[in-house]
């Protein structure tokens, strides 16, 4: 099978392996209130999804296609909730989540703390990187395009104190 053929080339770490190397996790849940412009964009997209998906009487093939379209719409809504630029490249404003993240990062820096930042969307990490670069925040970065040898070098660099943040895509960092 394809999975058996590619297994030697895929670097995956399980939580059990990684947890031994990490300090205890601190988890804080915060709510980010969308701006009016973000809320409008999200609501417009949600209504467009409902309009497209509200067809009645479908055969099995149409039902399968509808499931695929539903997942695509849900992904688009999740991306909009992260930052509208993930869906609309012309979006020039910030986002509520990015602003909240930047305020948290500032608090971390003031306390001389470091953090791991995970995202399922590499594009979202790219938006975050742009802001961090503007602010002069140092970081390590790892996504699926990072070669295996470079991944370990970046992990080692972060553990040695290089970078205030480590930005990691969930798929590349393991889930």
Locations of regions flagged by a protein language model:
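Cytochrome P450 catalytic domain signature, combining two hallmark sequence patches
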Residues: 48-55
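Structural signal for well-ordered, non-membrane alpha-helices
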Residues: 7-10, 50, 78, 129
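Conserved Helicase C-terminal RecA-like lobe
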Residues: 20-46, 58-175
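Conserved P-loop NTPase motor "coupling/switch" region that bridges the ATPase
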Residues: 1-19, 26-27, 58
């Amino acid at each position: 099978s394809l999975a058996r053929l590619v297994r030697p080339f895929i670097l995956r770490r399980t939580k059990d392996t990684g947890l031994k190397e990490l300090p205890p996790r601190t988890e804080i849940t915060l709510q980010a209130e969308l701006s009016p412009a973000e809320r409008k964009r999200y609501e417009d997209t949600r209504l467009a999804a409902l309009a497209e998906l509200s067809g009645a009487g479908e055969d099995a093939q149409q039902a399968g296609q509808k499931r695929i379209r539903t997942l695509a719409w849900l992904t688009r809504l999740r991306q909009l909730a992260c930052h509208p630029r993930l869906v609309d490249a012309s979006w020039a404003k910030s986002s509520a989540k990015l602003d909240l993240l930047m305020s948290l990062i500032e608090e971390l820096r003031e306390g001389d703390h470091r953090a791991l930042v995970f995202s399922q969307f590499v594009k979202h990490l790219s938006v975050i990187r742009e802001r961090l670069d503007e602010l002069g925040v140092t970081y390590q970065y790892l996504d699926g395009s990072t070669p295996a040898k470079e991944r370990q070098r970046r992990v080692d660099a972060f553990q040695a104190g290089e970078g205030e943040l480590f930005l990691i895509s969930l798929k590349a960092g393991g889930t």
